[in-house]
Amino acid sequence: MAQPSVILATASYDHSIKFWEAKSGRCYRTLQHTESHINRLEITPDKRFLAAAGNPHIRLFDINSNSNHPVISYDSHTSNVMAVGFHCDGNWMYSGSEDGTVRIWDLRTATCQREYESRAAVNTVVLHPNQKELISGDQNGNIRVWDLAANSCSCELVPEVDTAVRSLTVMWDGSMVVAANNRGTCYVWRLLKGTQTITCFEPLHKLQAHDGYILKCLLSPEFCDPNRYLATASSDHTVKIWNVDGFKLEKTLVGHQRWVWDCVFSVDGAYLITASSDTTARLWTMSTGEAIRVYTSHHKPVVCCALHDGAESAPS
């Protein structure tokens, strides 16, 4: 099976994963995932595999195969897996779960190499661009930095007591982190390096972005320069685009009829893919804020999406 240059996948409460031709909107492959719903999708840096985080397993599927069966399964979590991602060289994977743990996995052997206790359901985990720290957010409102070299929590803060942190995003150069919560608020910090290379948070901005929940926040990628943006997807059916310079509202993306659960930028920041409870995913052009493609084939809420339209990153 020939690999397309652009990998776009969506997952839905209809227990399926679908692969799409991004430009035409044609669905060319459907994977059945009957054992549970899927909370998060992530594509490996080399574009060979797709990780699907469910309850309580993570399944790894071969993108270039016609098989419905996963090539490997990661099985140590005991509840919903809400976050999944990869080290830049593709050798290991990280995850966060409602069982209160953050885990690191050997991608090839499926063994859990490390486990960090968050003491509350983990909703979101991101890898710092330095590839040496994980940042997690949980249901109790805690944000923790996990130092992978020291194998411990190096920093902990609570932006808003008893308000769940739904989503975290880190600027591509490691200069900024944003946390979004259940009250529609984004907290922004400048990331500073201490004398012992421990990441420190300097408060930068508080943004009341939505009246409803923020389900995903995402900073634009490196090649989006000179402008840098923050996208916030919400239960109010909209996605808002904020200019990081002053956090001025640039655009509101209107078109979805239900909650917007997930979003992902194209590698150049010119486009945004969104996933919604209205059973569709959409492709938006950032220059106009218009939806130029609607992906329709799911018959229940679409809760996550993954896009890889950049060059392959070969494993080391």
Curated annotation (Swiss-Prot):
This is Target of rapamycin complex subunit LST8. CDD domains: WD40. The target of rapamycin complex 1 (TORC1) is composed of at least RAPTOR, LST8 and TOR. PANTHER family: G BETA-LIKE PROTEIN GBL, TARGET OF RAPAMYCIN COMPLEX SUBUNIT LST8. Component of TORC1 complex, which is an essential cell growth regulator that controls plant development. Acts by activating transcription, protein synthesis and ribosome biogenesis, and inhibiting mRNA degradation and autophagy. InterPro entries: G-protein_beta_WD-40_rep, MLST8, Quinoprotein_ADH-like_sf, WD40/YVTN_repeat-like_dom_sf, WD40_repeat_CS, WD40_rpt. It comes from Oryza sativa subsp. japonica. GO terms for biological process: regulation of actin cytoskeleton organization; TOR signaling. The keyword Glycosyltransferase does not apply. Keywords: Developmental protein, Growth regulation, Repeat, WD repeat.
